[in-house]
């Protein structure tokens, strides 16, 4: 079985991004800038934000973090976003989720300039994705990362049956739309399964490419996968494991041990899809910089 190594690909991409940033610095005297806004204190979010800032620095991009109090009014957050929209040194704006209950997440998404929406969540970017204008939009980073893995590993997709488990706005919906686009990494017949789907296994067994993004540990078992399928595991779930120092370990939405015996190729957890998300965020930020500077 081929292991689709997202950690390795993300490291390769970091070197490519670093070279591009340095080249643009020598040409324009400027570098891409990413600003992350975090509201309140969430340990997982803080770790993720630190990782983003660290990776930005490693590739030569400017990175800043704006930390706001938990009780920040929505109006103030929107003012901060507006100032970033107008700042020519900022090419990517990301508001870390989750947000406190007094803030409307959709209002925040709408407030970000689509040209700086490097998370790919703005309705304008989603609409362009659905219409196939991929050169004029930003694609949500996790689906975009999966497409990058498919392309770099030369996985044949055209005309194949792709089954996506999950319909979230962050992964499931954009993933399904990406996989039906006329691209060399997609061009599939796509089925979407979700919590109301009856007999999910009857669909997953038909999948040439199976993408699991539901947030349920080891949900996909070997009997749900056909021999020779390509399996992409988006899930990150922490389960109890008394054999580890922490007493827990990370697993995906797929039972790796069982499914790996049948799959032709598969992403591990950790080290598969996860590392690609930040890499694609920086790639989107680079694209925003290129568009802003006519490069």
Curated annotation (Swiss-Prot):
- Positions binding NADP(+) in this chain are 166-168, 195, 236
Q: Does the keyword Cell membrane apply?
A: no
Q: Does the UniProt entry include the keyword Transit peptide?
A: no
Reactions the enzyme catalyzes: (6R)-5,10-methylene-5,6,7,8-tetrahydrofolate + NADP(+) = (6R)-5,10-methenyltetrahydrofolate + NADPH; (6R)-5,10-methenyltetrahydrofolate + H2O = (6R)-10-formyltetrahydrofolate + H(+)
What sections of the protein cross the membrane? none
GO process annotations (BP) = L-histidine biosynthetic process; methionine biosynthetic process; purine nucleotide biosynthetic process; tetrahydrofolate interconversion
Q: Which UniProt keywords apply?
A: Amino-acid biosynthesis, Histidine biosynthesis, Hydrolase, Methionine biosynthesis, Multifunctional enzyme, NADP, One-carbon metabolism, Oxidoreductase, Purine biosynthesis
Pathway, per record: One-carbon metabolism; tetrahydrofolate interconversion
On the tree of life, the source organism's domain of life is Bacteria
EC number(s) for this protein?
1.5.1.5, 3.5.4.9
Please name the GO terms that the record assigns under molecular function: methenyltetrahydrofolate cyclohydrolase activity; methylenetetrahydrofolate dehydrogenase (NADP+) activity
May I have one GO cellular component term? cytosol
Assembly and interactions?
A: Homodimer.
Q: Which family is this protein grouped under?
A: Belongs to the tetrahydrofolate dehydrogenase/cyclohydrolase family.
* Role summary: Catalyzes the oxidation of 5,10-methylenetetrahydrofolate to 5,10-methenyltetrahydrofolate and then the hydrolysis of 5,10-methenyltetrahydrofolate to 10-formyltetrahydrofolate.
The cross-references to NCBIfam families, in alphabetical order and at most eight, read:
PRK14174.1 (NF010771), PRK14186.1 (NF010783)
**What is the designated name of this protein?**
Bifunctional protein FolD
Origin organism of this chain? Chlorobium luteolum (strain DSM 273 / BCRC 81028 / 2530) (Pelodictyon luteolum)
What is the primary gene name for this protein? folD
